């Protein structure tokens, strides 16, 4: 995965993607209680879902049900192509059965408005 899609998008939007290795390094530093099944995660600039996908993988590895994982993840991005890719990645990981939850929870809009 590339860290940028285009120089224009970096300049206009400040769009840079966090590589999965760094995402996992950050997630490793979180305390154990954040992985409780009822805890939710909200990513206000989710991009293509690097954080949300890695969070979902961890929750699944802890034995959380895919439906519970889908219901616990929320994301916003201003770019439609990023939102589409984020949704696709989460559906691929969690299953088509949860597409409606994922589509509702991952929104295309400006998180600052």
Language model region names:
Residues 1-113:
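SAM-dependent methyltransferase catalytic region
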């Amino acid at each position: 995965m590339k860290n940028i899609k285009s120089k224009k998008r970096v300049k206009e939007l400040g769009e840079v993607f966090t590589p999965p290795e760094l995402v996992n390094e950050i997630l490793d530093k979180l305390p154990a209680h954040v992985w409780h099944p009822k805890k939710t995660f909200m990513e206000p600039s989710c991009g293509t879902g690097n954080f949300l996908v890695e969070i979902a993988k961890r929750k699944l590895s802890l034995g959380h049900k895919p439906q519970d994982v889908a219901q616990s993840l929320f994301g916003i991005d201003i770019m439609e192509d990023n939102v589409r890719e984020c949704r696709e990645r989460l559906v691929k990981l969690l299953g088509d059965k949860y597409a409606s939850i994922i589509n509702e929870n991952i929104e295309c809009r400006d998180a600052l408005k």
